[in-house]
């Protein structure tokens, strides 16, 4: 099984191959840009590029070694999973009756003297409306 240095070397080789292919792609695009490209020629060039990249990736021996290394990982996780947080504050509904709020017609208060809308001024208050 390869160690990390060997894998790093192979990955850097693939990276350099990809960079050289990038310059080749630029050259091809410049060549195609100088001509009047057709859709078929562009598709053929794109298919060739995809095939070349796929072949490079599939032929790389580091892929097999990486998969083997991943398969040989220990079953126990080396990283501790975060513990579940407690429930924290329980912010439920009010536990006391909120008399004096709500609308009796809507059933939101058990207080028969709850304020209603439109507001009806109590006797003795000036009439604002």
UniProtKB/Swiss-Prot annotation:
Signal peptide: none annotated. Its main location: virion. GO terms for molecular function: DNA binding. The keyword Disulfide bond applies. Keywords: Coiled coil, Disulfide bond, Host cell junction, Virion. Residues 122-129 are annotated as: Capsid binding. Residues 1-31, 38-59 form a coiled coil. Plays a role in virus cell-to-cell and plant-to-plant transmission. Interacts with virion icosahedral capsid and movement protein, thereby facilitating virion cell-to-cell transmission through plasmodesmata opened by viral movement protein. Also interacts with aphid transmission factor, attaching the virion to aphid stylet when the animal feeds on an virus infected plant. Aphid saliva may later detach the virion, inducing release of infectious particles when the animal feeds on a new plant. Belongs to the caulimovirus ORF III family. Homotetramer, through coiled-coil domain. Homotrimer when interacts with icosehadral capsid. Interacts with capsid protein, and with Movement protein. This is Virion-associated protein. It comes from Cauliflower mosaic virus (strain BBC).
């Amino acid at each position: 099984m390869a160690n990390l240095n060997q894998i790093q070397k192979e990955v850097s080789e693939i990276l350099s191959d990809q960079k050289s292919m990038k310059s080749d792609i630029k050259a091809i695009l410049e060549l195609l840009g100088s001509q009047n490209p057709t859709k078929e020629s562009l598709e053929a060039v794109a298919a060739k590029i995809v095939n070349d990249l796929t072949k490079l990736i599939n032929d790389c021996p580091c892929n097999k070694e990486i998969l083997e290394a991943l398969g040989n990982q220990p079953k126990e996780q080396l990283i501790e999973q975060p513990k579940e947080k407690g429930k924290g504050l329980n912010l439920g509904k009010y536990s006391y009756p909120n008399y004096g709020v709500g609308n009796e017609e809507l059933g939101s208060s058990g207080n028969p003297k709850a304020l209603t809308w439109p507001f009806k001024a109590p006797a003795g208050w000036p009439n604002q409306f």
